């Protein structure tokens, strides 16, 4: 069955850089068969983005959210763990988050959607380091070029049932006096400080870590490929090493190509 998917490009500034323009042009060139959204705020002049897209006969659909989400990285992270963000796109099956430091090499979007993962991103190395620093592949994965199953994200964010069980709650409140601990455990077993709304509000780190590490630590696990499987979807750090691990084949796309090994590796493919 063909999945209904979209590309979502978050933008927060009027002037587009040289690198961002390369990224946007490649997106419009390679993924023009798909619906492409610009996610931004109402006050932003996006004419530079529209002008580039028009050269490829691509119509960018604008979707506005509150401006504080675009005032810095913290705001962006809040947006991508919010119920409202995914609910806006609930009529689609999958979204490809395509930040403008990503680059796509060929159109494999339908193929990856057909695999029915909940989340795919470039694999990380242990301690967020690199192969060159002696780290091994660890887990999936980076959110800058990532595929997300929208229904799964909505279902998680709509579920207000208690999350942690009795043992985990005892461990959480272990340092409190016994009666206080018992009372807090009982309250938490019916949802007090123990539902998705609470954990979303308390969370202050990167949004991709929320989905790939924080939620699994609470017992909520997404269907994701292994890090080795994800190499053919996207790569970020240690691109030359991962390219070799992928039998010298380019992945579907990549992230932060201008940041990691551009002159020594990526320049032969992206220029």
Predicted features along the sequence, with ranges:
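Short beta-strand/turn micro-motifs composed of small residues
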Residues: 9-13, 38-42, 121
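N-proximal low-complexity "stem/linker" segments adjacent to membrane-targeting elements
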Residues: 1-25
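Active-site-proximal specificity loops/subdomain of glycosyltransferases
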Residues: 39-93
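Short, aromatic/basic amphipathic alpha-helical patches
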Residues: 22-26, 46-57, 211, 215
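Conserved donor-nucleotide/metal-binding helix-loop-beta segment in metal-dependent transferases, i.e.
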Residues: 103-134
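Short, acidic, metal-binding catalytic loop of nucleotide-sugar glycosyltransferases
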Residues: 24-34
């Amino acid at each position: 069955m063909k999945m209904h998917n979209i590309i979502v490009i978050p933008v927060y500034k009027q002037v587009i850089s040289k690198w961002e323009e390369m990224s946007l042009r490649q997106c419009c060139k390679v993924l023009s068969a798909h619906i492409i959204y610009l996610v931004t705020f109402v006050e932003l002049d996006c004419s530079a983005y529209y002008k580039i897209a028009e050269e490829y006969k691509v119509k960018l659909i604008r979707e506005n959210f509150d401006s504080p989400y675009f005032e810095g990285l913290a705001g962006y992270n809040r947006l991508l763990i919010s119920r409202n963000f995914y609910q806006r796109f609930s009529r689609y099956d999958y979204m490809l988050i395509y930040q403008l430091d990503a680059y796509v090499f060929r159109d494999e979007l339908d193929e990856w959607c057909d695999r029915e993962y909940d989340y795919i991103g470039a694999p990380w190395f242990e301690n967020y380091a690199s192969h060159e620093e002696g780290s091994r592949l660890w887990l999936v994965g980076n959110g800058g070029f990532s595929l997300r199953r929208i229904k799964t994200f909505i279902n998680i964010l709509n579920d207000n049932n208690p999350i942690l069980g009795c043992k985990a709650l005892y461990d959480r409140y272990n340092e409190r006096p016994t009666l206080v601990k018992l009372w807090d455990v009982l309250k938490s077993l019916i949802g007090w400080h123990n539902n998705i709304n609470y954990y979303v509000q308390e969370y202050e780190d990167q949004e991709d870590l929320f989905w790939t590490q924080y939620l699994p630590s609470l017992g909520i696990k997404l269907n994701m490929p292994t890090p080795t499987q994800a190499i053919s979807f996207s790569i970020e750090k240690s691109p030359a090493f991962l390219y070799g691990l992928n039998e010298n084949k380019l992945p579907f796309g990549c992230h932060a190509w201008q940041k990691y090994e551009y002159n020594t590796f990526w320049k032969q493919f992206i220029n």
